Amino acid sequence: MEQLKAAGYSRVALVSLDVIPGMEYNYDMGVYQNYKNDFKKMTLGTSLMYWQGQAEQADDVTETIKAMATQFPKQGKHDAILIMAHGTPQVSNAYYSVIQAKIDELGYKNVYVYTVEGWPSLETVMPKLKANGIKNVTLMPMMMVAGDHANNDMAGSEPDSHKSILEKAGYKVTPYIHGIGENKAIQAIYVERANDAWQALEATSK
């Protein structure tokens, strides 16, 4: 922001690359509040998942799930997909319950969301695998990039990694080491978010 000010920009559209409006999105809002009066016009776009389809708003959650589903492997009755999200100590952690509910509503069978640092945890989800006779598990991050959490917490060789825990429980595990930022359908949604922020900037400039 300081560089933009120094360069003489007067209109700024902030685009968030956050998945849900959690702690990092609060930081984005803080940046917006701190700098909005330093420019003639400034707007802030929403996170990947923000609106949930109520009160005539868009259903970002359903849109995102459908986009992620383009990378789901073909499933048999003994196969499950576990989607690893980050998790947050904030109230926005409730988004993951909404995501799971909409996954179920859309008819995706044996697809479960769990978190690294929130609820539900892997241990919360594992009983569902046993109850449904699952033998094969695909682990998939719901994060922009496949970084430390994906490579180590999810798919690492250490005994406390999610892959190791599941393998010890008798499951065949296949990690999918790609962030959702590589997903073309997700990229298209982020372009929509950027366009929304820009259009809001244009609207406030008239």
Question: Which functions belong to the PLM regions below?
Answer:
Residues 1-138, 144-206:
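Extended amphipathic ligand-handling, pore-lining, and cofactor/metal-binding catalytic surfaces
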